């Protein structure tokens, strides 16, 4: 078969392997690259290379993550795999590796285990929208009824956490056997299962909406006045696009929002007709006084986001070694919450039955800010104390 050349025209998705330790996530990642390398869709990456994941820093937190890339006939994928359980938690909460979908690896010999459950819950909490299941190590199970039983258990667990357990594709195979064989053909007893998995990922996980197609939002980083022209706010467009003449809403830091019109957009001192996600811009706002706008607010498409003070979140608390707290904290703890461009004080309420939170824990909590911020589900934040990061979190639901 002719080598597939990397076409930038293929749509791009971010995915990753999740699941319990030793169920075969890293072996599967290696097997996917090995199988696809046979048709020129990847560079074969060994288990050892993936396992020695380099350290990365995201929001002041060190995370070990391995990235591989590969492509099928229709898509290009960036795939993340983490060596340790704590790395997964940190990765998912900080959004260091935003996943459009994930491959849940479950050992057919063991069935779902505690981290299987925890990774499914985290996926639900942080908004990983789609899961495909790979039941691994089927070569170690002789009894087909046992396989059916494990599949049923996995589907029930997914349904429990509000994923469509009955509809999710569940594929079976042995990542190790496919990796050892390495022929990569669809006819092969072991390699064919890797192809079946990739076909399922291709067809079941839809393409994500591009940032540019979402409603406009720009966190305000700075504000200044141009004499005779008016007030300019600067920042990087997070999503969507803004055109000269568009109505925009200023949201956050106050109870009320304020609508205005964007009368000018410039980037690198050049005037533009419009700007889109990723651009660093200055926007001229009609009739807005310098005192009415400050860092920490956002410019957004009117009605697309509200200023709120109360929300629920999933939080990872840094360990002492990571530069976090040395001692636990309790309900009523009042740190700073850093959203986008600014710190706001908030009060933490712990769930019933949770007395205290230790460094290294991940926990669900309710938070009440003293100042309203433009908040939505999936928004990431850091928890800071005296200028240093002590935790990272993601908004899971809003309390209006």
UniProtKB/Swiss-Prot annotation:
GTP binds at residues 19-26, 81-85, 136-139. Keywords: Cytoplasm, Elongation factor, GTP-binding, Hydrolase, Magnesium, Metal-binding, Nucleotide-binding, Protein biosynthesis. GO terms for molecular function: GTP binding; GTPase activity; translation elongation factor activity. Residues 19-26 are annotated as: G1. Residues 60-64 are annotated as: G2. Its main location: cytoplasm. Residues 10-209 form the tr-type G domain. It is found in: Cytoplasm. Signal peptide: none annotated. Residues 174-176 are annotated as: G5. It catalyses: GTP + H2O = GDP + phosphate + H(+). Residues 81-84 are annotated as: G3. One of its GO terms (cellular component) is cytosol. Pfam families: GTP_EFTU (PF00009), GTP_EFTU_D2 (PF03144), GTP_EFTU_D3 (PF03143). It comes from the Bacteria. Its EC number is 3.6.5.3. InterPro entries: EF-Tu_GTP-bd, EF-Tu_GTPase, EFTu-like_2, EFTU_2, G_TR_CS, P-loop_NTPase, Small_GTP-bd, T_Tr_GTP-bd_dom. The keyword Iron does not apply. SUPFAM superfamilies: EF-Tu/eEF-1alpha/eIF2-gamma C-terminal domain, P-loop containing nucleoside triphosphate hydrolases, Translation proteins. Residues 136-139 are annotated as: G4. Mg(2+) binds at residue 26. GTP hydrolase that promotes the GTP-dependent binding of aminoacyl-tRNA to the A-site of ribosomes during protein biosynthesis. Monomer. Belongs to the TRAFAC class translation factor GTPase superfamily. Classic translation factor GTPase family. EF-Tu/EF-1A subfamily. HAMAP family: EF_Tu_B (MF_00118_B). This is Elongation factor Tu 1. The lineage of its organism: Bacteria, Bacillati, Bacillota, Clostridia, Eubacteriales.
């Amino acid at each position: 078969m002719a080598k597939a050349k990397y076409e930038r025209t293929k749509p791009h998705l971010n995915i990753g392997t999740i699941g319990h330790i030793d169920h075969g996530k890293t072996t599967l990642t290696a097997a996917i690259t090995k199988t696809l390398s046979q048709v020129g869709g990847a560079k074969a990456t060994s288990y050892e290379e993936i396992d020695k994941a380099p350290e990365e820093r995201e929001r002041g937190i060190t995370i070990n993550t391995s990235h591989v890339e590969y492509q099928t006939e229709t898509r290009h994928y960036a795939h993340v795999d983490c060596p340790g359980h704590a790395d997964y938690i940190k990765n998912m909460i900080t959004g260091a590796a935003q996943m459009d979908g994930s491959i849940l690896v479950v050992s057919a010999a063991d069935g779902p285990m505690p981290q299987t459950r925890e990774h499914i819950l985290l996926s639900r909490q942080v908004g990983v929208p789609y899961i495909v299941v790979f039941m691994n190590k089927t070569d170690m199970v002789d009894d087909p009824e046992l396989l059916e039983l494990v599949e049923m258990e996995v589907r029930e667990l997914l349904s429990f956490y509000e994923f469509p357990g009955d509809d999710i594709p569940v594929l079976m195979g042995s990542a190790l056997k496919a990796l050892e064989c390495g022929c990569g053909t669809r006819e092969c007893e072991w390699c064919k299962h890797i192809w079946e998995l990739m076909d399922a990922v291709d067809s079941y996980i839809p393409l994500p909406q591009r940032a540019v197609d979402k409603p406009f939002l720009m966190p305000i980083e700075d504000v200044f006045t141009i004499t005779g022209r008016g007030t300019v706010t600067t920042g990087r467009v997070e999503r969507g696009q803004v055109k000269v003449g568009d109505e925009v809403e200023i949201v956050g830091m106050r109870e009320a929002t304020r609508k205005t019109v964007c009368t000018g957009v410039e980037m690198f001192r050049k005037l533009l007709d419009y700007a889109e996600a990723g651009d660093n811009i200055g926007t001229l706002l009609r009739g807005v006084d310098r005192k009415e706008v400050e860092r920490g607010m956002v410019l957004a498409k009117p009605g697309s986001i509200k200023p709120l003070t109360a929300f629920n979140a999933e939080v990872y608390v840094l360990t002492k070694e990571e530069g976090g707290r040395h001692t636990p904290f309790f309900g009523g703890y009042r740190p700073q919450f850093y959203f986008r461009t600014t710190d706001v004080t908030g009060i933490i309420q712990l769930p019933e039955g949770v007395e205290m939170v230790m460094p290294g824990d991940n926990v669900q909590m309710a938070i009440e800010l003293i100042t309203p911020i433009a908040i939505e589900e999936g928004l990431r934040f850091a928890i800071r104390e005296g200028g240093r990061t002590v935790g990272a979190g993601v908004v899971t639901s809003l309390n209006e």
